[in-house]
């Protein structure tokens, strides 16, 4: 990709490419022929904005372009994770060829039941295009939904179900959550939003979903919380 940057006028940066070359883009010397960089998504933390501004390179993103696709994945993970579907599938595959298959299934299936979502509480951090969709879907599943977003737009607010409860601070939200999902861009101010301090506020056994940016979660704090049972595995 870096070699091609010297020969094109527009660079389209997809999420897949970001995973394999974000550092390269931040440190790349752009040719004078480069006019614009388009980010397929909302976050632009993988693009050197100051340098692009100095060189007159237009940078634009496409927030919400894949919002529905991501929201569906979040809901899928919410259901499958809570009901232990991945573990159950792996276990079932291990029964292949068993002479006592029906008996084995009947005996072992209860270990994968997992909690139902209806009546449980989910906290949604960030109520933009993706977070709002996740919140509304969770309402439809019969969950109690708490929302936290100090920068929520008017359009996003109008799109939310009336059933979504507004939390002024994370301290108001976290102690009540059985599930927690985060949907904010990566900025210096949002780095490690989920950390040892915020996890300590949560219920024991909280389930955490992050389909936004890895940098939003302190991995060491998360590993510790998984080890103690503060966060469900």
Question: Which role does the model predict for each range below?
Answer:
Residues 63-121:
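Phosphate-binding beta-alpha-beta segment of Rossmann-like dinucleotide-binding domains, i.e.
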Residues 127-128:
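Glycine-rich Rossmann-fold phosphate-binding loop(s) that bind the pyrophosphate
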Residues 2-5, 30, 116, 172-176, ...:
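Structural alpha-helical scaffold elements that stabilize or flank donor/cofactor-binding regions
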Residues 16-23, 146, 150-233:
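Rossmann-like adenosine-cofactor binding region
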Residues 131-132:
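N-terminal Rossmann-fold NAD(P) dinucleotide-binding loop
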Residues 137-138, 202:
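Aromatic pocket-lining residues of Rossmann-like dinucleotide-binding sites
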Residues 1-60, 195:
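An N-terminal-biased, well-structured beta-alpha scaffold segment characteristic
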